[in-house]
UniProtKB/Swiss-Prot annotation:
Mode of membrane association: Single-pass membrane protein
A GO cellular component entry from the record: membrane
Name this protein carries in UniProt: Uncharacterized protein MJ1535
Record lineage: Archaea, Methanobacteriati, Methanobacteriota, Methanomada group, Methanococci
Keywords from the named record: Membrane, Transmembrane, Transmembrane helix
Transmembrane regions listed in the UniProt entry: 4-20
């Protein structure tokens, strides 16, 4: 009987011990999971803080290169921290602007996390085909993110428009921005009806100076109402503004106009200092044509 009682007591002790161990193991597992979760949160927070601190410490665009690879042109650049080491960032925008002496040619914004990386730290922008009115160009790169605003400038060369391409571009700009009108002047003695159709600022390429110049242009139509062919050859062609005259420097000189025929042409003048009370003035023989122009919307 004592033996049976002893065996019974031992079984109870063993069962209690197993239950205690299981409880301890479960508690240990819960504690370990909590520790791992806390460590993960701490690490994520640390990474976020580190990235934020690093971004705030970015001091400059340290390197900026223009790279030619076959027919492709690329911009490569690297950011640097305050201590001079190169930086890799995941946020921010990059604005690239390209200028020549005529003005802005290219302006585009890129997200830095979408740019390819070369050698681990050099961001790369592949440029489209860019042409300018001059061979030399200025490249301005700006990195922006929150309160960070950094710029760097470098200089390089670009493909230049041909003279024919320049003329096409200048013609298009002129017709898009000029003032359209229908100012008529007729002299019975001359028998020529002269009509101003269009006028405004115009650009020309001067191959003597290799520069783009801003001038003033007037487009017109002349119709011969005489019973005979007429030699259209105006003299003293100029623009008048106040007490200043701006002489013709290009355009139609003379042309023969048939009976009841109409011809179109234009004249180019040095750019007036002022466009107030601007008039077109010329003579046909001894007969003066003095035509007031309206300057509304001229820029």
């Amino acid at each position: 009987m004592k033996r049976l009682f002893f065996i019974f007591v031992m079984l109870i002790v063993l069962l209690c011990g197993c239950t205690s161990n299981k409880t301890t193991n479960v508690n240990n597992e819960i504690n370990i999971n909590k520790i791992e979760t806390n460590k993960t949160l701490e690490n994520e927070s640390l990474i976020q803080k580190t990235e934020k601190n690093q971004l705030a410490k970015i001091k400059e665009i340290k390197y900026m290169y223009i790279v030619k690879e076959g027919n492709k042109t690329k911009i490569q650049f690297a950011l640097a921290y305050e201590n001079g080491s190169l930086a890799r960032v995941s946020n921010g925008k990059v604005v690239l602007k390209i200028f020549d002496d005529s003005g802005l040619l290219f302006n585009k914004t890129y997200y830095i996390n979408e740019l390819p990386l070369k050698a681990g730290y050099y961001y790369e922008i592949e440029l489209p085909k860019i042409k300018g009115f001059y061979k030399n160009a200025k490249f301005v790169l700006t990195f922006k993110n929150d309160n960070v605003n950094l710029s760097k400038t470098t200089y390089g060369t670009i493909e230049r428009y041909s003279e024919e391409e320049m003329k096409e571009i200048f013609e298009k700009e002129y017709h898009e921005n000029s003032i359209k009108t229908n100012i008529e002047e007729f002299r019975d003695v001359v028998g020529i009806k002269f009509t101003v159709k269009e006028y405004g600022y115009y650009k020309i390429y001067n191959n003597q100076t290799d520069r783009i110049e801003k001038v003033f242009r007037v487009d017109f139509v002349a119709k011969n109402l005489n019973p005979d062919t007429y030699e259209f050859a105006p003299i003293g062609v100029c623009l008048i503004s106040g007490d200043k005259k701006y002489w013709k420097i290009g355009g139609l000189d003379e042309i023969e106009i048939g009976i009841n025929q109409e011809i179109a042409g234009y004249w180019i003048f040095n750019k007036p200092d002022s466009i107030e009370n601007l008039r077109l003035d010329f003579k046909m023989g001894n007969i003066v044509y003095d035509i007031p122009l309206t300057q509304n919307n001229l820029k």
